């Protein structure tokens, strides 16, 4: 249970594929919720039915809450829901903490943190990894940037949504770490797609190949979680291609800022471009293999 009445009330902004299950995990942990989403999705009503209070705006969602969590799509969205005319900054009380769990620009994160600090409001950037399954099960990895004391105070909130929770450094460090994560994730996805496509093109039993290689040194989260979905033709999104592309764009921008070449991430970015061009932007990132299937004229599926 939360230690104080102040921290027991949480404003949650953004109830999409990730945000809704994350919010739902806070309720059984003893927190009360005020929730807001920019569109009236069915998931909003699901959270309200579970005990959340519907807010009329980000400002309203933040009002009276000791913690405000944002989980939206992109950098401009975070700027709008926190700093916009009806943003959370206009409703949140001094001494409260805003936790942005979106994946956005580290530069904008630092700007938002500075604006909130002027109002006496703390900020943590706490992007996540683990996909929709991790969000549903409360097992997300959470990469945090901010002050140690603020992190310690908010740790019980984060523990209701995740398991592997690390404070990396000051504001922006969480976002930079998430970009490092997205490099590793996207390149692992690319490697898995190439391996499965070679097996299919060579007329192998792709299921047997996946079973064989995922149990050894080639094993990865992608092999375990996305490989079986590919073989069953399941491309429903846990994390959409278009969102992976948004993150890879941030990776490329960050690399450019420090004059660093990232050929693996760049190649993954280009192959996801092919997937998007074929009309699969709203599918899960396992749809990366469709770029290879188009090239080979053959699908990688279980027989």
Residues covered by each model-derived region:
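NAD(P)+-binding Rossmann beta1-loop-alpha1 motif at the extreme N-terminus of oxidoreductases
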Residues: 1-70, 96, 101, 132
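Rossmann-like NAD(P)(H) cofactor-binding subdomain of soluble oxidoreductases
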Residues: 58-63, 67, 75-140
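Small-residue-rich helix-loop
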Residues: 204-216
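Hydrophobic beta-strand scaffold residues
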Residues: 33, 54, 122-124, 165, ...
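Interdomain hinge/lid region at the active-site interface
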Residues: 171, 175, 219-286, 303
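Hydrophobic residues within alpha-helices
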Residues: 22-26, 112, 157, 198
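Rossmann-fold dinucleotide-binding core
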Residues: 10, 104-182, 186
């Amino acid at each position: 249970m939360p230690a104080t009445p102040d921290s027991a009330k949480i404003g949650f902004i953004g109830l999409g594929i990730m945000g809704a299950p994350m919010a739902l995990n806070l309720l059984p942990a003893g927190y009360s919720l005020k929730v807001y989403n920019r569109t009236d999705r069915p998931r909003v009503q699901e959270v309200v039915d579970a005990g959340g209070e519907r807010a009329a705006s980000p400002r309203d969602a933040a009002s009276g809450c000791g913690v405000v969590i944002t989980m939206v799509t992109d950098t401009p969205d975070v700027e709008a829901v926190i700093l916009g005319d009806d943003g959370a900054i206009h409703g949140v009380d001094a001494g409260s903490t805003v936790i942005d769990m979106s994946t956005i620009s580290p530069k904008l994160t630092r700007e938002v943190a500075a604006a909130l600090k002027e109002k006496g409001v703390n900020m943590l950037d706490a992007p996540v990894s683990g996909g929709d399954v991790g969000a549903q099960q409360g097992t997300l990895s959470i990469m945090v940037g901010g002050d140690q004391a603020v992190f310690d105070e908010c740790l019980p909130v984060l523990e209701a949504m995740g398991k592997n929770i690390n404070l990396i450094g000051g504001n922006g460090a969480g976002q930079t770490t998430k970009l490092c994560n997205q490099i590793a994730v996207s390149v692992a996805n690319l490697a898995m797609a190439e391996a499965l496509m070679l097996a299919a093109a060579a007329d192998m039993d792709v299921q047997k190949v996946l079973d064989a290689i995922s149990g050894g040194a080639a094993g990865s989260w992608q092999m375990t979680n996305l490989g079986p979905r590919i073989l069953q033709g399941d491309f429903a999104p846990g994390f959409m291609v278009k969102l992976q592309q948004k993150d890879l764009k941030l990776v490329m921008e960050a690399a450019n800022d420090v004059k660093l070449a990232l050929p693996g991430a760049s190649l993954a970015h280009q192959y996801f471009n092919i997937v998007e061009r074929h009309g699969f932007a709203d599918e899960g990132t396992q749809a990366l293999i469709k770029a290879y299937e188009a090239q080979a004229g053959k699908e990688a599926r279980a027989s």
